[in-house]
Amino acid sequence: DGPLRPGVEGIVAERGLADRVLFLGDRKDVAALYQAMDMFLLPSLYEGLPMVGVEAQCAGLPLVCSKEVTDEVSIGEATFLPLETSARQWAHQVSQALERGRDLGLRAQGEEMTRTAGFDITHEADRLAHRYQALAEW
């Protein structure tokens, strides 16, 4: 959500896509929404490390994003494209991501990919506890 939402909603309506595009606003049930998706598209202009991309992959979704997104977002299956790439090529990459997601069984691998990439709360808590212990013993 943001100040551009009404304009984007207008564009969607003008193009006859209102029955295919949902604007859901702020949600507390994002994990359930990820389970209803087949892949995640993130064509962002300005991003550092978008946690939404990490979360989507944790849910086992293949990710297609712009090259403006940092490489660190990739914990498994991410494709990066320049924003200047044609809509046809973006659509092709989305199609490829959907196929890869099915072929690799990403849903079942999401939790392991998360842990391997270091986005695991238990691992991070242990690491922080060890650092504090080392400081206390210093």
How would you name each of these model-derived features?
Residues 1-9:
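Glycosyltransferase donor-sugar binding loop
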Residues 9-25:
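Nucleotide-activated donor-binding/catalytic signature segment of Leloir-type glycosyltransferases, i.e.
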Residues 26, 45:
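Aromatic "clamp/platform" in nucleotide-sugar-dependent glycosyltransferases that forms part
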Residues 40-41:
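A short hydrophobic beta-strand element within the catalytic core of glycosyltransferases
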Residues 48-55:
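Short glycine/serine-rich donor-binding loops of glycosyltransferases
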Residues 62-66:
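Short hydrophobic beta-strand element within catalytic cores of glycosyltransferases
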Residues 102-138:
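A charged, aromatic-enriched C-terminal amphipathic alpha-helix characteristic of glycosyltransferases
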